[in-house]
């Protein structure tokens, strides 16, 4: 079973541990999420909890969005996401999910959309090296050879194209601090996306896998 919360990336800062160690952290605003809908296997084919984050003015929302929010007795939301196979417990539509869903020291997976860089060449996009810059060279920043005697381009070739703007998950990040008063999570390291971009935080999958494997090994 999983648990999670939706949030907005604020920026990065640093904190000091009790040992005096400096730890870079990402500040994530996790204003209480509202449970918009509970999906079940019987009705929807899978189990999930739908959360809503960041209020949206009704004048900017359409009728279906307003009606969906009204069922949860809340306002329309800018960011709606699902937590699959969530720990339901006594949770019901309209309840709030707060920052204390996670504890300090827990590991989480954070999903966000990376910064978009537009159309870029191989040197910037794929970290390739440039050619000689002398007058006699005819190869400076172009892509290299695509292979010998082929009349097509193989899939996966590193060529110029759009860079960034992709959904990326950073795995196994540690929750350094849970600030319930300010509705903030401090997560060690960086998370994908620009400041003010939306992120989804779930408990770490690999952490659970490692624990289960260690238990099997000990048996």
Swiss-Prot record:
GO terms for molecular function: rRNA binding; structural constituent of ribosome. GO terms for biological process: translation. GO terms for cellular component: cytosolic large ribosomal subunit. Disulfide bonds: none annotated. Residues 113-142 are annotated as: Disordered. SUPFAM superfamilies: Translation proteins. InterPro entries: Ribosomal_uL3, Ribosomal_uL3_bac/org-type, Transl_B-barrel_sf. Part of the 50S ribosomal subunit. Forms a cluster with proteins L14 and L19. One of the primary rRNA binding proteins, it binds directly near the 3'-end of the 23S rRNA, where it nucleates assembly of the 50S subunit. Belongs to the universal ribosomal protein uL3 family. This is Large ribosomal subunit protein uL3.
